Regions:
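Alpha-solenoid helical repeat scaffolds
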Residues: 1-7, 16-529
Length: 529
């Protein structure tokens, strides 16, 4: 009868009949149907009435608790939701409590007042925080809620409490990794201590990635080497290790690690493994190409899965074709990329422009970007690329105008400050202003090797050779790069350390033999490697 009323357009009457039947029969399916009908009719109070009746009639049914909690949150009755959460956790079997506690931040995510949500959850989990079997999970959840509320000190304290409750629990360490950038003083020693022992491979990998971002590459290498030794079947460990070795110019070691990743990933049915496989194969192709092994590079690219990122794959293929002297084919590969949305269309434009810029087709790159920017005039990625093209075209006023607009729109982004400062330094003009801009960039990203390179270069232009040498050596150690090698070698040469300069330039050639800055610098000093 209730369903007939619903079908005939009287959902209210149908709801009442079904709820009455549920009360008489104590049938959970009827209670759930009543709740669903009320929710479909956007009647939160009726849904809550049905869920509470369900809980009263069938107290052992935990599904009713879940509905009550979610409905109360939808009605923004946060304090009542906290009480419902406490009851819900308490009534679950012990084996299910930690998983339920871990899901709480997701359940409370829609609450607008994050501080109230965090306070409510901590109060609701009071018993779980004191119980040894649930304390680590509960403190982790409290920490996540405090983090989302912007209460960093409380999030840090929750992390410590969770770690103290159970040193083997992964939750507090995952939370610590998420807080490491915001609270390095507190989280760095905690993580370093934890990583001395045995941890899940995902956690050690996360810590290694954190170290790479600092950048503390030597420490990251140590963590990745241990990860590979302890978990040789963990494919992602080999991938990240190989990519880091490639980035630091250790190509033979990088190839060995990436080959191991390919072996593991190709044997896996995991879809996520295919993403890593594509990245590894493209990196192997790039290394083979750099060493002049062009047919081997083609073989690696031929193995890339069909569902790989089409823009990344096309870019790698175009780069290989370019090195083979097949420029028009390379350009066509990029032009034929199919895009499904605005974001992909922008990425396509950017890789096309970068290819044109690197191959000295600057007017074509400028025209391409101008057309794209008529459709997306506010796109900061397009603006950044336009600034680089303008610099190559020696349209310095237009370049500066674009970069200053970027500074206004993204004052927390160091790259526009660095780009303008470096351009001024490279042209040996307005050096005091260049230093100010680069110093501002370095405040925003103090560990960025490319910004350290820029500051070293402006110091050199200002005649501060000792400062320049120290900055450039630090930058090159952190990020071996052909352009940084060009700058460091020039400083060494001018300071009379010509043997050391030659060694640095040769190392730069191994990294990227066709780097314009490096080639021009060696030519200017008549250096023959």
């Amino acid at each position: 009868m209730g369903e007939l009323n619903v079908r005939s357009g009287s959902p209210g009457s149908g709801f009442s009949i079904i709820l009455d039947a549920a009360r008489k029969t104590r049938d959970p399916a009827l209670f759930q149907r009543a709740v669903d009908l009320a929710l479909q009719s956007r009647s939160g109070e009726s849904a809550l009435q049905a869920a509470q009746a369900w809980k009263s009639a069938v107290p052992e049914n935990t599904e009713a608790n879940r509905y009550i909690l979610q409905i109360l949150l939808a009605l923004n009755r946060v304090d009542e939701a906290g009480k419902a959460l406490s009851v819900s956790i308490r009534e679950l079997p012990a084996a299910e409590q930690n998983a339920a506690i871990a899901s709480v931040p997701r359940v409370f995510a829609r609450v607008q007042d994050k501080k109230t949500a965090a306070d409510t959850v901590e109060k609701a989990l009071a018993a779980a925080l004191k119980q040894s079997s649930t304390a680590a999970a509960a403190w982790t959840t409290v920490g996540r809620m405090r983090r989302e509320a912007g209460q960093l000190a409380l999030a840090v304290e929750a992390t410590r409490q969770g770690r103290a409750a159970d040193a083997s629990a992964p939750g507090p360490l995952i939370l610590a990794l998420s807080l490491a950038n915001a609270a390095p003083t507190e989280m760095t020693p905690l993580l370093a201590q934890a990583m001395k022992g045995a941890v899940q491979p995902e956690l050690r990998l996360g810590y290694a990635r954190h170290l790479i971002g600092l950048p503390q590459q030597a420490e990251a290498m140590q963590q990745l080497a241990r990860l590979n030794a302890e978990h040789p079947s963990f494919a992602d460990g080999w991938l990240v290790h190989g990519l880091l070795l490639q980035e630091t110019g250790k190509l033979a070691e990088a190839e060995q690690k990436l080959r191991q990743h390919v072996t593991l990933a190709q044997a896996s049915q995991d879809k996520e493994a295919q993403t890593g496989l594509a990245e590894a194969l493209m990196a192997l192709a790039q290394m083979a190409q750099r060493q002049g092994q062009l047919s081997q590079a083609e073989q690696w690219l031929a193995q890339v899965p069909a569902d790989a990122d089409p823009i990344k794959l096309a870019s790698r293929r175009a780069d290989l074709l370019t090195q083979q002297g097949r420029l028009e084919e390379a350009r066509q590969v990029l032009a034929q990329i199919k895009t499904n949305n605005t974001e992909q269309a922008t990425r396509k434009t950017l890789v096309q422009s970068m290819w044109l810029r690197e191959n000295k087709r600057l007017d074509e790159a400028y025209t391409l970007l101008k057309q794209a920017m008529t459709e997306q005039p506010q796109n900061t990625d397009l603006m950044s690329e336009m600034a680089m093209v303008n610099e190559k075209l020696k349209r310095f006023d237009e370049m500066e105008s674009v970069l200053r607009e970027l500074m206004k729109r993204k004052p927390e982004d160091p790259h526009a400050f660095n780009a303008l400062g470096y351009s001024l330094a490279d042209r040996n003009t307005r050096l005091d202003e260049a230093r100010q801009l680069i110093t501002q960039a370095l405040k925003l990203a103090p560990d960025d090797a490319y910004i350290q390179d820029s500051l070293g270069w402006v110091a050199f232009r200002q005649g501060q050779y000792a400062e320049a040498l120290q900055l450039l050596q630090t930058a090159f150690k952190a990020r071996p790069d052909a352009e940084i090698a060009a700058h460091l070698g020039e400083v060494l040469w001018v300071m009379g350390q010509r043997q050391e300069a030659g060694a640095v330039w040769r190392e730069g050639l191994l990294l990227k033999a066709d780097n314009d800055t490096l080639v021009e610098t060696m030519k200017r000093f008549q250096f023959k490697p």
